[in-house]
Amino acid sequence: MPSFTPSALLRRALCTVLGLGTCLGVQLAQAQSVSEYGMKAILFYRLSQFVYWPADNKPPTPLTLCIVGKNPFGNALGQIEQSTATFETRPPPGDLSNCQFLFIPRSEAENLGTWLTRAESRRLVTVSDIPGFAQLGGMIELPLEGERVGIVINRSSARKSGFEFNAQLLRLARVIDR
């Protein structure tokens, strides 16, 4: 699994906080490591700041970001300052009643259709690193693209539930409309 140096991680996190900037293009390094999932944990957390919610579905504060099934982030989530959101792991079948964001890990790929249906019925923002997630109807995919973590956004899926994304995020992401 690729790794990130703490300075690269800090630089990327700072860029994300300041409007994402060029942080998604920072090269991975070989020194002291932070895992691929450490970077994805930060993105999962920061994405909540770039989603516009429908008027009839305003989220509570703090947000609850849920991970279903096996948590791929390990202890990376515990290292993130959680002032605007909390993380919860939900074992399948998973109670999603208090969730606003739903991360569906690769370990749940065979149940993807079920999770997407449940998330749509609850109007949750869906995020995953399952290959092809956005093409399959998920809202935000976090693929590993060489040595970078990318972002793929399916605007059609998001709009179906009334969500829209900040223009800064859309400029940095690969956007599909299906």
Give each language-model segment a name.
Residues 2-18, 24-178:
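Short hydrophobic alpha-helices and adjacent helix-cap/hinge residues
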